[in-house]
């Protein structure tokens, strides 16, 4: 969500800040990756993302809106013909900021902001959707964990009694599980 900027602007006044961000965006689209300060990169990210979204629309009005920000026709053409098709299936998140360390002269935090041009890998759906589609299959699965939940409880009791050997504890746990199963069948 865009928030109004409070405090000092980049480079002095608001007009100069707009020009600096336009130049940074032009360099980003021209070179696909630029190195700048962290503050400038954080301010550039929403501007660049909005311009890429316009480029994905691809109509004349979107091209004119981008030309109002970036004056270079060659960069706008590259944005609409080369970059937009590469990010067509991506819904936002067109840029990546990577920290590089601090600048030698003034110790300013430096970052690399780059366009994310890799194809999107689809996420695997969780198993919740499969259980919702097959509620009949979910019922036997719900009973099985209840029986298995008794076993860890017995193992924790076995851990407290250190006098018994591991073989004796597993035999005792198996006997208790069988006794519980017999009680369930009697009911």
From Swiss-Prot:
One of its GO terms (biological process) is translation. One of its GO terms (cellular component) is cytosolic large ribosomal subunit. Belongs to the bacterial ribosomal protein bL17 family. Pfam families: Ribosomal_L17. Residues 127-144, 167-176 have a biased composition (Low complexity). Keywords: Ribonucleoprotein, Ribosomal protein. The gene is rplQ. Residues 145-157 have a biased composition (Acidic residues). The keyword rRNA-binding does not apply. Part of the 50S ribosomal subunit. Contacts protein L32. It comes from the Bacteria. Residues 122-187 are annotated as: Disordered. HAMAP family: Ribosomal_bL17. SUPFAM superfamilies: Prokaryotic ribosomal protein L17 (SSF64263). This is Large ribosomal subunit protein bL17. One of its GO terms (molecular function) is structural constituent of ribosome.
């Amino acid at each position: 969500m865009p928030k109004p900027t409070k405090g000092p602007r980049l480079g002095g006044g608001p007009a100069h800040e707009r020009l600096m961000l336009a130049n940074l965006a032009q360099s980003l689209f021209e070179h696909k990756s630029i190195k700048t300060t962290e503050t400038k990169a954080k301010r550039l990210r929403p501007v660049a993302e909005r311009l890429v979204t316009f480029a994905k629309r691809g109509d004349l009005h979107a091209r004119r809106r981008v030309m109002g920000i970036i004056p270079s026709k060659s960069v706008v053409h590259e944005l609409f013909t080369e970059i937009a098709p590469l990010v067509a299936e991506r819904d936002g998140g067109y840029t990546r900021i990577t920290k590089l360390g601090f600048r030698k002269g003034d110790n300013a935090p430096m970052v690399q902001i780059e366009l994310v041009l890799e194809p999107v890998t689809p996420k695997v759906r969780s198993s919740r959707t499969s259980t919702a589609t097959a509620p009949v299959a979910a019922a036997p699965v719900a009973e099985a964990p209840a029986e298995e939940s008794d076993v860890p409880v017995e193992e924790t009791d076995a851990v407290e009694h250190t006098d018994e050997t591991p073989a004796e504890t597993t035999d005792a746990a198996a006997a208790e599980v069988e006794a519980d199963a017999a009680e369930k069948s009697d009911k």
